[in-house]
Every structure is written in structure tokens, then in C-alpha cells.
């Protein structure tokens, strides 16, 4: 959690690892064994389910829900309300 900000009401469960200079916003849920890289922003109400890997400099929008055990690459943007069921490569914008 070095130099990271965890906002009011965010929940970070067992064995989750948060990189440097991240923002974990209000009412976000980071489940067990999640790894979040450096310089990431997890927006309000996002749910990152167990064993997900989030690359460096990635933005996860408000209300995003991820399936367990997926990987999100570096420098990616996941837009508001997306439901991620598969891996996302680096440098990708996911928007419906």
C-alpha cells in the first residue's frame, strides 16, 4: 500500500497486494489474492474478484465487476459498469 490511498468504505480482503501510488475508491471491493500493479485507479463501487491480476497504470471504472482468476494488462482502461469475464491485454480500452 506504499503511497496508495484507500478511500472510506473500500474493502481489501486477505492476501491482496496493492502497488505504489494507487487509488482504491469508495465502496470498492478487492477480493482475496488480487494483485494490483503500480499507479492504478480503482473507481467507486468496482468489484475485483479473487485471484485477479491488474497491470500497472490501469484504470478500472465505477461499478466494474471482474470474474475470478482473470488478468488485466498494463495501461488498460475498463469503462463504467463493464462485466469482465476474460483476460484483457495491455494497452486496451474496454467499452460497450
PLM regions and their residue ranges:
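Glycine-rich hexapeptide-repeat left-handed beta-helix
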Residues: 26, 35-38, 43-96
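Extended, small-residue-rich solenoid/repeat segments and analogous flexible loops
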Residues: 1-27
Amino acid at each position: 500500500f506504499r503511497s496508495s490511498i484507500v478511500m472510506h468504505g473500500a474493502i481489501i480482503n486477505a492476501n491482496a497486494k496493492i502497488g505504489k501510488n494507487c487509488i482504491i475508491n469508495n465502496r470498492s471491493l478487492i477480493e482475496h489474492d488480487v494483485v494490483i500493479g503500480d499507479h492504478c485507479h480503482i473507481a467507486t463501487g468496482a468489484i475485483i474478484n479473487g485471484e485477479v491480476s491488474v497491470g500497472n497504470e490501469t484504470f478500472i471504472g465505477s461499478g466494474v465487476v471482474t470474474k475470478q482468476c482473470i488478468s488485466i494488462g498494463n495501461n488498460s482502461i475498463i469503462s463504467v459498469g463493464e462485466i469482465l469475464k476474460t483476460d484483457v491485454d495491455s494497452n486496451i480500452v474496454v467499452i460497450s
